[in-house]
Amino acid sequence: MKFIILLFVLTNAFAQTSDLRTIAEKSGWKSTGRAIETELLCKAFQKKFPKDVACKSYGKTPEGRNLLYIMVGDRNPKNPVVWAQAGIHAGEIDGKDAVFWLMKDILEKKITSNPLQGVTLIFIPIVNVDGHERFGKWNRPNQVGPEEMGWRTTAHNLNMNRDFMKADSPEMQAMLKLWLKVDPIVSLDLHVTNGAQFEPEVGIIIIPNEFHGSTSLHKAGRLLENGLMEKLKARGHKALPFYPSFEEEDKPSTGFGRYVSNPRYSQGYWYAQNRIGMLVESHSWKDYATRVKVHYSTVLSTLEMVGQHGKDWVKAAEETRNNVLAGKEVNLSYKHNDKSRLIDFPGYKYKIQKSDITGEDVIKYFPDQPENWKVPFYEVLYADSKVMAPKEGYIIPGTHAKWVKEKLDIHGIRYQSWKPSGNDRLEVFRSTTKEFAKTSFEGHQQLVVTGSWANEEVKIAPGAIFVPIEQKRAFLIMQFFEPVAKDSFVSWGFFNPAFEPKEYMEKYVLEDVAKEMLKDKNVAAEFKQRLKDDAFSKDPAQRHDFFYRKHASWDVKYNMYPVFRK
């Protein structure tokens, strides 16, 4: 009944289109509205500002709710586009209320200079709408306000901010289609932190950035970072150019580090698409009003920066996309090294104490006692995974072509039919080590492999597809098809059966087979040499496999990745 009354009040209020304030603003930043408020606001903005606002749907959720986006600005197709998405984790909903507030202030000319001059804003108020409607007071126990909020995951219990590459959720598939269509130069993902307590209000990660590369787009990322830090400081905010997560959990003395996100995450994915990605994390222990305001200021400052530099950044992005990767060494991922510098960090007094509840050490903060921490900051990165790109591209056999094509279509990757020529000389990847995850993660059993590519003769059956490396999404293609990449199809378990043994040789059968094989002097000498290794000598399974792998019955496709390179 309460919800029906609220719906009636909202419908009548927005029908007048004179008051475009959110429930959050009307409540003094104590509450946030439901999804119906977003729909009504979307239409009300469009009605009041038809030349500046377009309210559109880009799909439906599994539970039948509308997926909405709002286009704000003069819609000149030559404008650089800024993408701002909120509520991918629906309990972290600051961005929804912040951008509606900012839109109102811009369109009602409460901001002196128009930050949308020459810029188009694409705003998704709620990415995870089904999760948003799982409303509750304790959905975010590590967060101060609003009074009620949505849930982290979708109706399928998927975390959408792990879904950018595999795109399992219908919501992600729909959103990526829209993202490709509008092609933003800068994309913001608006979140709220978990974790420690400290003074700064927001942490912002921008990639690409000069701390891990030197292209024009990396330089653009650093320029945006520096500009945002200056603007946010001028607007009275305490902001950080990194995500404030301790190197070791609950140990402030271990400090912080920079990192380049893998493409399962929003900002890592946008970087893999050769665009600028921003993760904006307001601090969960600040009150809702403070958090909404810092999101407001961050989006406003970003619009100002893109208005000033956006066209140059678009050119830089296209230059980066047009870089030919074929046959070159490519850095797939990064880590920071052990070098650090001490920084002053505005934290709070804390102590580590033994818990009477769990018996372990826990941290206790004293937010009423600010304290300067001198902690290490790790900012020197190195590539922890490097791969030579194929000279021409990747070949996917017909057995996997159907589902692979569906994934490639979602991400805007071009492919074509492959015409086999009998036995093709191709690069084949065979794993030397593999480790399956012990538990399911996001509905997948992940797999980590090591190995190498080597030339072999391969017979490809009809129905295969070819993904050329010379296209503008080449870096993203390598993230999908290089098996050692952290978010590749292999890593997400799409090819697990290829790395599972299916046939075997009984122990009693091997006894006779091995004795016959030992009549070969070369085999006997190799076996004798291997027996000098204690690990081999004491492991019956390794000794068994030594002979089985040399036998004609051995499965030559076992541990062979069923995608090839040319």
Short names for language-model regions:
Residues 1-19:
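Bacterial Sec-dependent N-terminal signal peptides
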Residues 78-88, 93-253, 258-264:
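Active-site/substrate-binding loop(s) of hydrolase catalytic cores
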Residues 473-475, 484-566:
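Accessory, solvent-exposed terminal regions and/or long lumenal/extracellular loops of proteins
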Residues 65-66, 74-81:
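Proline/glycine-enriched tight loop/beta-turn segments at coil->beta junctions
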Residues 245-426, 430-431:
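Hard-cation-handling environments
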Residues 354-492, 496-515:
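Feature captures C-terminal
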Residues 58-60, 72-73, 86-88, 124-128, ...:
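Active-site-proximal beta-strand/loop segments in catalytic clefts of secreted hydrolases
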Residues 17-68:
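Short glycine- and acidic-rich boundary segments immediately preceding or forming the N-terminal edge
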